[in-house]
């Protein structure tokens, strides 16, 4: 009976560690995507700043293009970059939390294995 409980606890801890590792990897992938979005927005903003005010600025929305002005496009790219930066910071905080939980689960797993011997 006790052996079955230990076996079940072992499986649960192992599942938790694997799930946490997968979530950390997924967070890293999301972080890369947001970092790329931030770089694109900042680069586009820098390019827009150097352009003339008299030009027409079009923004693609789905299958159509909207005519906008330079200031609104620069502001839009600034907000996109800020949102991506905020998401990256949130992902970093979540990663720290998950890593703490992973360390705790791994130590519990080690204790369980040692108690089984």
UniProtKB/Swiss-Prot annotation:
Subcellular location: Cytoplasm
InterPro entries: PFD_beta-like, Prefoldin
Keywords on record: Chaperone, Cytoplasm
Annotated SUPFAM superfamilies: Prefoldin (SSF46579)
One GO term (biological process): protein folding
Primary localization class, coarse: cytoplasm
Domain of life the protein comes from: Eukaryota
GO molecular function: protein folding chaperone; unfolded protein binding
Any one annotated GO CC term: cytoplasm
Keyword Cytoplasm attributed: yes
Cystine crosslinks: none
Function: Binds specifically to cytosolic chaperonin (c-CPN) and transfers target proteins to it. Binds to nascent polypeptide chain and promotes folding in an environment in which there are many competing pathways for nonnative proteins. Has a role in gonadogenesis.
Assigned protein family: Belongs to the prefoldin subunit beta family.
Quaternary state and interactors: Heterohexamer of two PFD-alpha type and four PFD-beta type subunits.
Annotated protein name in UniProt: Probable prefoldin subunit 1
Gene it is expressed from: pfd-1
């Amino acid at each position: 009976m006790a052996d079955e409980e230990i076996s079940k606890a072992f499986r649960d801890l192992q599942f938790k560690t694997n799930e946490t590792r997968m979530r950390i990897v997924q967070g890293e992938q999301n972080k890369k995507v947001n970092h790329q979005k931030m770089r694109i927005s900042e680069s586009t903003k820098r390019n827009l700043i150097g352009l003339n005010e008299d030009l027409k600025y079009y923004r693609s929305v789905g299958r159509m293009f909207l005519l906008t002005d330079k200031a609104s496009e620069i502001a839009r790219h600034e907000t996109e970059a800020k949102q991506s930066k905020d998401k990256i910071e949130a992902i970093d905080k979540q990663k720290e939390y998950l890593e703490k939980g992973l360390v705790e689960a791994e130590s519990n797993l080690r204790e369980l294995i040692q108690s089984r011997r």
